[in-house]
Amino acid sequence: MTVKVQISGTLKEYSRQSSEINISALNVGAALEALQSEYPSLYNCVCDETGRVRRHLNLFVNCDLVPIQNTNGFDTLLHSGDVLTIWQAVSGG
């Protein structure tokens, strides 16, 4: 099933300047695997060397936060037309 991945901010430079990517995936883990094969530089910005999502990023499916602190979040199901958003946390002083 096809889902839309929305890329925020500076991560666009790793997605060939696209703010949206269409991929085929059944769950969040499969979506990340698709990113790894199609956009390896983007994947490396999103996930660390162990495959976990980096701490300064959040993933949302249709505006619902994905619990990526544990690997169960990778099992979050995706349906055709869903939107997976990769959101980069911003902070300052």
Q: Model segments located where?
A:
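Ubiquitin-like/PB1-type beta-grasp interaction modules and other compact soluble beta-rich domains
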Residues: 1-92
